[in-house]
Amino acid sequence: MALPKIEEVRQLSDEELAEEIIATKRELFDLRFQQATRQLENTHEFKHTRHRMAQLLTIERERQLNINQSSSTSAEEA
């Protein structure tokens, strides 16, 4: 599995982004569980999944800040 591109994440809608975050959190949980029970064969999947989670959370935070910046800018203009 190749590391995902940030451009792919930016194209997601807000709802898709939220769903993807939940799915990735679940995947991390499953990977941790597999590791604890010594069933995990591909340990590099942790890196890929954590990288994906970081991308998703970064895009989510950028969108929150853009919303706040645009609303505060319009409030300052008034």
From Swiss-Prot:
One of its GO terms (biological process) is translation. Keywords: Ribonucleoprotein, Ribosomal protein. One of its GO terms (molecular function) is structural constituent of ribosome. The keyword Ribosomal protein applies. One of its GO terms (cellular component) is cytosolic large ribosomal subunit. It holds the Pfam family Ribosomal_L29. NCBIfam families: L29 (TIGR00012). Belongs to the universal ribosomal protein uL29 family. This is Large ribosomal subunit protein uL29.
